[in-house]
Amino acid sequence: MQGEESLRILVEPEGDSFPLMEISTCETEASEQWDYVLVAQRHTQRDPRQARQQQFLEELRRKGFHIKVIRDQKQVFFGIRADNSVFGLYRTLLLEPEGPAPHAELAAPTTIPVTTSLRIRIVNFVVMNNKTSAGETFEDLMKDGVFEARFPLHKGEGRLKKTWARWRHMFREQPVDEIRNYFGEKVALYFVWLGWYTYMLVPAALTGLLVFLSGFSLFEASQISKEICEAHDILMCPLGDHSRRYQRLSETCTFAKLTHLFDNDGTVVFAIFMALWATVFLEIWKRQRARVVLHWDLYVWDEEQEEMALQLINCPDYKLRPYQHSYLRSTVILVLTLLMICLMIGMAHVLVVYRVLASALFSSSAVPFLEEQVTTAVVVTGALVHYVTIIIMTKINRCVALKLCDFEMPRTFSERESRFTIRFFTLQFFTHFSSLIYIAFILGRINGHPGKSTRLAGLWKLEECHASGCMMDLFVQMAIIMGLKQTLSNCVEYLVPWVTHKCRSLRASESGHLPRDPELRDWRRNYLLNPVNTFSLFDEFMEMMIQYGFTTIFVAAFPLAPLLALFSNLVEIRLDAIKMVWLQRRLVPRKAKDIGTWLQVLETIGVLAVIANGMVIAFTSEFIPRVVYKYRYSPCLKEGNSTVDCLKGYVNHSLSVFHTKDFQDPDGIEGSENVTLCRYRDYRNPPDYNFSEQFWFLLAIRLAFVILFEHVALCIKLIAAWFVPDIPQSVKNKVLEVKYQRLREKMWHGRQRLGGVGAGSRPPMPAHPTPASIFSARSTDV
């Protein structure tokens, strides 16, 4: 009853007074600790912005916040801290997540430690949700120039600078608990996840490297490469309008050898391995997360309850927003999202147009290299254009996703963040992978055949695959995009904040004014750091999700993707640490017990990876045609001679025949006088050039393989998920033990209240309550 009475006194307002100011048991801290600062430009007293500024600050004072004003030459700094009464209310609201036992007095509660992270989190929430009498929020005032910035202060970061945020500590274990104490659980979980992801990339990277190196054994020994290199008598039909000449198949010898570095039988094994790897990675991560949040006392922490408590601290008259669902709003959002996806697909078509036009442009170029290597130049420049498109569309996608979230009107900040994550990732996925989907599954399949080619606007012939297939194009596209994202993005991610910080510091030092007040110097130093926002950590997660997509989706075409990701992540961990500690203002510490919606994103990518890799092996690589030839048309079946290579004659078998007289303008092709036949990659029969029986048989086998591959891979994923429990037994046992001890404690207090009848001795509590005190309590220390 005493706990309920104290909660009533703290929450219920009396008349016009604010309840926090009525708490006499909480005294102001003796030592002033300013952890949060607002910054504004100096205004004259007649400036209307000055009055609006004072109204906002007065509202904060009324809610129990202390404000210290320090004026500099151009700025005014407002140090803000909460009265102890605010933390008293916080303790009471979150004293026991499950509520007190009926008819039982609770033991004296363990005091929730008022850490710097907790103070910052409460102050930040109230500042962001505080409203003046005119209904203006801090964001409204910032837009009108009333305030310039808000940020928590860096304090006590010296140890993190020495032990974590340095390049020489790249291979050291991260001080996760110190990161959590300084930046909060959300940032700490990001680094825990990133560290675990990097660690798990080691076996994937080594396996991918082994598969790639095994291709070198086929560099000279491959029967297919030998036949291509020795095919001096086979003339290939012109691939496009830029190449109006016949080409000997042997001229593509080097290209064919390079293709077989990664288009070999090991690709299938590696694709299945990566499907299993993705599942094991996620399952073991869930176990790792369970151990970490148990250690942090957050196993039963409820984000929604925490946000409601902060809302009540900010405004005792806060009205709960119930869950609502509007089918009309959901339909509008779905339609708008689909329109954006169609735009992404349209961007892929723009890239197709570019590649077609670039082929025509390079073929008439005055540069000999471009004229001779048209296909290579088109592939490389196309990848660069796609990378630039990604940078531009990322900004557009963010704005669209934000507008969709505003229209959807989510209840809470966490719900808004979750929905924004889904919208933004969906748009980013199509932005990054649209060109890869085109190359993998469309390129060379809709271009018709020699003599009757599909043309863009009736003028330009669509590009075709190389004589060795489209796998090389897909490999180059992935290598360039992923390589640029890992190298350029990391360079920009570090250099831009570093240069910006240096420029801000130089401009401040040129003024020649150095404050004497050490507190003002500290606040000014924090002000000169690079600003952060809600998306700072979100952007880091998004970058890693896209990288994870490149590492798993289409990995059959690029087995070196895990190796590139491993090297990139080793740099990324320290790069993010240096940014957060040295170059940026302090992030607002936020609590979390998992990585949220990102886990669903990872699981979705895992499923898409199985489907995409199955289709790449079936439709893009030459694996299925090779297997069908080996067991249906191979000379091994006819001669019964084991010494004969079963792929002998495969190249000739996979090329269709075209009569040069069927060209619309055969005389316009260089060297056509003595050529009656040319070959091209397809399964068609002259004279009508319709698809042959082999084509339909291969198509059936390809579809059957996709279904079989997906079912086998998904079954392996399900078995792995079942075999590896999400929560370790040790965690379950600790949780069970604490539940039992807690019930015994309540039983003892209940018997004491009833007069001591059969009360017995007080049950012993766990000797080491750190990880096992998760239910005692409070789950609020940071």
From Swiss-Prot:
One GO CC annotation: endoplasmic reticulum
Disulfide bonds: none
Keywords for this protein: Cell membrane, Endoplasmic reticulum, Glycoprotein, Lipid metabolism, Lipid transport, Membrane, Phosphoprotein, Transmembrane, Transmembrane helix, Transport
Domain of life per record: Eukaryota
Reactions it catalyzes: a 1,2-diacyl-sn-glycero-3-phospho-L-serine(in) = a 1,2-diacyl-sn-glycero-3-phospho-L-serine(out); a beta-D-galactosyl-(1<->1')-N-acylsphing-4-enine(out) = a beta-D-galactosyl-(1<->1')-N-acylsphing-4-enine(in); a 1,2-diacyl-sn-glycero-3-phosphocholine(in) = a 1,2-diacyl-sn-glycero-3-phosphocholine(out); Ca(2+)(in) = Ca(2+)(out)
Activity regulation behaviour: Cation channel activity is activated via phosphorylation on serine residues by cAMP-dependent protein kinase A (PKA).
UniProt modification remark: Phosphorylated on serine residues by cAMP-dependent protein kinase A (PKA) which is essential for activation of its cation channel activity.
UniProt-annotated stretches for the region Disordered: 756-782
Protein name: Anoctamin-9
Species, as recorded: Homo sapiens (Human)
Lineage: Eukaryota, Metazoa, Chordata, Craniata, Vertebrata
Gene of this entry: ANO9
